[in-house]
């Protein structure tokens, strides 16, 4: 999968599916499920590392998890999902050179193909243009931007006329700066629907209604593994309960070495 495929999908009216992964196990599952894009999001700071925000996530941690995600794929590189990784807080806000170094570190040391960053401030637009000149594809992110949590909070954005006009202007600027797609997080559905028609690049929604060019979800939310479930992410599986019950069954077993008599470990099948 390539970035140009996503633009083609928009023209064809094909929904784009984006799921997060944070290690080899999660990426192998997401790949087998058929996602178009795997996002190594800095949300791993909350989902995996136990932080209350994404702000503590470092570039070294993003590289560690991105490499693990890329090692988990089974298919040949040309048939793998597109891998996009987040640039963590303060890895691109402090200047173009630092942003190029951060993005280059992630892409040179993994098979990731693109980076995602938040906002459309003038300094951010300069960073995006510089990255693209260096041959690094960029996905934008507007609406609820978790790296601005102390300024904007974890709440729905673009609720009034001024902020709605700004998000339309920002999306246009991200497109003109060269972004291949934009994530819209936690904004009114009618605004996302209008914005989708306002720009030529794909609009990927999360908590932004169903009328987007695609949807992105945190995999742990879909599987019901998250401790704090977002209001816009309905779980499709009671994952925590299933895992807890399975582990309890093993813990309470009289024979901890017991193997399911109908299953031989040597005959287990891989999705590869």
Swiss-Prot record:
Homology family: Belongs to the PanB family.
The keyword Transferase belongs to this UniProt entry's keyword annotation: yes
Obligatory cofactor(s): Mg(2+)
Designated name of the protein: 3-methyl-2-oxobutanoate hydroxymethyltransferase
Keyword Metal-binding appears in the UniProt entry: yes
Binding site residues for 3-methyl-2-oxobutanoate: 42-43, 86, 116
Metabolic or biological pathway: Cofactor biosynthesis; (R)-pantothenate biosynthesis; (R)-pantoate from 3-methyl-2-oxobutanoate: step 1/2
Function description: Catalyzes the reversible reaction in which hydroxymethyl group from 5,10-methylenetetrahydrofolate is transferred onto alpha-ketoisovalerate to form ketopantoate.
Assembly behavior: Homodecamer; pentamer of dimers.
Keywords from the UniProt entry: Cytoplasm, Magnesium, Metal-binding, Pantothenate biosynthesis, Transferase
NCBIfam families reported in the protein's UniProt record: panB (TIGR00222), PRK00311.1 (NF001452)
Catalytic site: 185
Cofactor remark from the record: Binds 1 Mg(2+) ion per subunit.
Gene Ontology BP annotations: pantothenate biosynthetic process
Annotated compartments: Cytoplasm
């Amino acid at each position: 999968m390539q970035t140009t495929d996503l633009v083609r999908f928009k023209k064809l009216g094909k929904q784009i599916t984006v799921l997060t992964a944070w290690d080899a196990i999660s990426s192998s599952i997401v790949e087998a499920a058929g996602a178009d894009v795997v996002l190594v999001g800095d949300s791993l700071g909350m989902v995996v590392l136990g932080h209350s925000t994404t702000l503590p996530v470092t570039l070294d941690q993003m590289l560690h998890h991105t490499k693990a995600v890329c090692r988990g794929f089974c298919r040949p590189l040309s048939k793998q999902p597109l891998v996009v990784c987040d640039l963590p807080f303060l890895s691109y806000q402090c200047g173009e050179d630092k942003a190029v170094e951060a993005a280059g570190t992630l892409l040179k040391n993994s098979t990731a193909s693109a980076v995602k960053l938040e906002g459309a401030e003038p300094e951010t637009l300069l960073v995006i243009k510089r990255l693209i000149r260096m041959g690094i594809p960029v996905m934008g992110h507007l609406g609820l931007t978790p790296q601005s949590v102390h300024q904007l909070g974890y709440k729905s954005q673009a609720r009034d006329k001024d902020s709605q006009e700004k998000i339309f202007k920002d999306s246009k600027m991200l497109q003109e700066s060269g972004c291949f797609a934009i994530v819209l997080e936690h904004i009114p559905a009618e605004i996302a629907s209008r914005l989708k028609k306002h720009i030529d690049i794909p609009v990927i929604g999360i908590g932004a209604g169903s009328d987007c060019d695609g949807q992105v979800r945190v995999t742990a939310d879909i599987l019901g593994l998250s401790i704090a479930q977002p209001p816009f992410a309905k779980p499709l599986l009671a994952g925590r309960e299933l895992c807890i019950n399975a582990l309890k069954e093993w813990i309470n077993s009289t024979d901890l070495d017991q193997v399911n008599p109908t299953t031989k470990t040597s005959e287990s099948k891989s999705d590869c």
